[in-house]
UniProtKB/Swiss-Prot annotation:
TM regions (residue ranges): 19-39
Function: Catalyzes the transfer of an acyl chain from an acyl-[acyl-carrier-protein] (ACP) to a Kdo(2)-lipid IV(A) to form a Kdo(2)-(acyl)-lipid IV(A).
Gene behind this protein: lpxL
GO molecular function, one term: Kdo2-lipid IVA acyltransferase activity
Keyword Transferase listed: yes
Designated name of the protein: Lipid A biosynthesis acyltransferase
Keyword Transmembrane helix carried by entry: yes
Listed GO biological process terms: Kdo2-lipid A biosynthetic process; lipid A biosynthetic process; lipopolysaccharide biosynthetic process
Residues spanned by motif HXXXXD motif: 134-139
UniProt-listed InterPro entries: LipA_acyltrans, Lipid_A_LpxL_LpxP
Length: 311
């Protein structure tokens, strides 16, 4: 079941205006040939550089506010430690994205392991909503799982057509297909064909098709209702969370797959969205330092006239 809408390589991608982009990709791929322990140091260096750029300072302010909103009872100095580690992780994410897109299967397997794979194998005939969260390791996590259990990714097309093509090629290295995050019909069809779809419900996509439910200490977080439509349209599908984690000792990565979460007792979209947020919270707490705190998770408020939480 291939998606014919996937971006295709275009001859004009070789035009002079893209040459600088191609040079950057060539340098990126060359760096990725280095041993993994060296790549870790380079990634941390990128993170240090990011934190000292203006864009990094802006994102750091957003991340600091997100942590304050989610964990108001946590001492400020503890939140600051998490923030600094998170900023350092941003640089490593650049390296890990390249690993996911360009490394060979054998090299990926050498530096990774999967725990809980049996949950996918035992439920693959029912269709699986593989709930991911926006960890900085998400690209690599999808590649690792795909080597053991290929599935279908859900993504937002990139505004840059060349980057959109490149990221699609990278994401298909060990997976079956990609679907636009707005293609709910395609997701439902995939589940009914007993496929596994990677689905991340933890970004603020605006008030359309959304409800406001708790997320950590924020009681009214804008949360997509896509989960409701997926589960009600394919009622046999299993919801299975996973988290791609960095091993603290520098030995690579562990993808942690959890047991299926039951949603059969819930009937309305608000309750389903709230439980999905609880799943996301649990996964985030497996390593709070690698979550994408740099996004404005709480930008949409229930009342449009309410002041922004980021002002």
């Amino acid at each position: 079941m291939k998606n014919e809408k996937l971006p295709q390589f275009q001859p004009h991608f070789l035009a002079p205006k893209y040459w600088l982009f191609w040079l950057g990709v060539a340098i990126w791929r060359s760096i990725l040939c280095l041993p993994y322990p060296i790549l870790r140091h380079i990634g941390h260096g990128f993170g240090w550089l990011f934190s000292h750029l203006k864009v990094g300072e802006r994102r750091a302010a957003i991340a600091r506010r997100n942590l304050e909103l989610c964990f108001p009872d946590m001492p400020e100095n503890e939140r600051e430690v998490i923030l600094q580690e998170n900023l350092r992780s941003v640089g490593m994410a650049i390296i890990e994205t390249g690993m996911a897109w360009f490394w060979s299967d054998s090299r990926i397997k050498k530096w990774s392991k999967v725990e809980g794979l049996h949950y996918l194998k035992e439920n693959q005939k029912d269709g699986i909503v593989l709930v991911g969260v926006h960890f900085l390791t998400l690209e690599l996590g999808a590649r690792i799982i795909g080597l053991h259990h290929p599935g279908i990714g859900v993504y937002r097309p990139n505004d840059n057509p060349l980057l959109d093509w490149l990221q699609t090629q990278g994401r298909l290295r060990s997976n079956k297909d990609m679907l636009d995050r707005k293609d709910l019909r395609g997701m439902i069809k995939a589940l009914r064909h007993e496929e596994t779809i990677w689905y991340a419900p933890d970004h603020d996509y605006g008030r359309k098709n959304a409800v406001f439910v708790p997320f950590f200490a924020v009681p009214d977080t804008c949360t997509t209702t896509g989960s409701y439509y997926l589960l009600k349209s394919s009622q046999n599908s299993k919801v299975i969370p996973f988290a791609p984690l960095r091993n603290k000792d520098g030995s690579g990565y562990t993808v942690s797959i959890s047991a299926p979460v039951d949603f059969t007792d819930l009937q309305d979209e608000t309750a389903i969205a709230a439980r999905m947020n609880q799943i996301v919270e649990k996964e985030i707490m497996k390593d709070i330092t690698i979550y994408m705190w740099l996004h404005r998770r709480f930008k949409t408020r229930p009342d449009e006239k309410t002041p922004s939480l980021y002002d």
